[in-house]
Amino acid sequence: MSDFNIRKNPLKIIIVGPQKVGKTVIANSLSEFSHTISPDYHPTVGVRVLETEKDYTNEQVSNISILKKNKISKVKIELWDMSGDRRFESTWPAIKYGANGVIIVLDAVNDKYEGVIDEWMNNFCSEINPDNVTCFSYKKEDSKGIVKNKQSHQFPNMTIAEVNHSMESLLPNFHKFITKLLIQMK
């Protein structure tokens, strides 16, 4: 990441996880594309790229050396909303190329995704610093059941943020993640 030019290039964040866990809902909310959740499921075909910008205050910029050095307070971000369908697995190497960070999305109440964090980490994070990965455990509005404690066995220090259907905690957790990425950049 040392040769990354924040003035010319947007941060590339890939959003991965199993099918039907809410990756698109989260990507839409983060990009401010849509804050409404459709009751109909429409699977992502391959990948969708959404663009957004994050504004930083002068105080925040002074704490993030890459922003201070480049005299900028606005960061462009590309969110790569990936299909969880394994039939697109052949495209994954091209999609993950040049990624600055990864968001793994899991269903907060579904037991069938046990151990899935490590699987997605192995597929998408082999060339990325584990500190540049976060996980959102998403509880859909119609989800029944108790939120399961999700944890990576291989990466026990990875942040796992719980996000409910109202998305209240989504933006603060996303901004923490982006700030952490920017602080690590030189």
Question: Which residues does each predicted region cover?
Answer:
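TRAFAC-class small GTPase G-domain
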Residues: M1-K186
